[in-house]
């Protein structure tokens, strides 16, 4: 059984990557971990005006993210109706890369599938890309799904690496599996 991590920020792009994963592995048993990473600095105080005095901002943020992931899982189960697929929601309140690394280690993740918008020019230099950072800083293979990409047949695949990385058989077998 494959173990796949699906990071999401609930954007259209990340949901597209999740749907791509469902299609790509429709015939294989998989455990899918859907991860959302939250940071307090991501929120503006106006967003939290409705928080009651007994609730903490932290709990409110985590609960909202858990509810959103639960909704995604419900939609996936209904849309794909696949008994081979199992889902678990994970919400973390941490640094994005640290969270990805912790989850991949804890659950022995075989592959990370995530969306990418492909930041260009000055935007890439200043902000970078979450997907690019995951590729650079995580040992687990990453399948980056471009914005709007749908699964048809794979006729092109980019294998990005640097000259310092030595790949093991397990990492390369994921690429072989994807290529069929």
Label every model-predicted segment.
Residues 27, 100-150:
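Gly/Ser-rich helix-loop-strand patches that form or flank binding pockets
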Residues 53-67:
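A short acidic, glycine-rich active-site loop
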Residues 33-35, 88-92, 143:
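General small-molecule cofactor/ligand-binding pocket signal
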């Amino acid at each position: 059984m494959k173990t796949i991590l699906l990071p999401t920020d609930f954007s259209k792009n990340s949901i597209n990557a999740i749907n791509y994963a469902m299609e790509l592995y429709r015939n294989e048993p998989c455990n899918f971990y859907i991860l959302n990473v939250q940071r307090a600095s991501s929120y503006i105080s106006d967003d939290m005006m409705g928080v009651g005095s007994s609730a903490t901002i932290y709990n409110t943020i985590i609960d909202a993210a858990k509810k959103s992931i639960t909704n995604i899982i419900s939609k996936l189960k209904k849309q794909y109706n696949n008994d081979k697929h199992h889902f678990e929601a994970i919400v973390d309140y941490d640094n994005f890369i640290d969270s990805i690394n912790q989850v991949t280690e804890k659950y022995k993740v075989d592959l990370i599938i995530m969306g990418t918008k492909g930041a260009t020019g000055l935007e890439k230099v200043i902000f970078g890309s979450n997907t690019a950072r995951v590729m650079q800083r995580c040992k687990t293979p990453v399948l980056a799904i471009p914005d709007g990409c749908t699964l048809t047949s794979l006729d092109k695949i980019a294998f990005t690496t640097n000259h310092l990385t030595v790949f093991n058989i397990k990492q390369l077998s994921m690429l072989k599996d994807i290529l069929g």
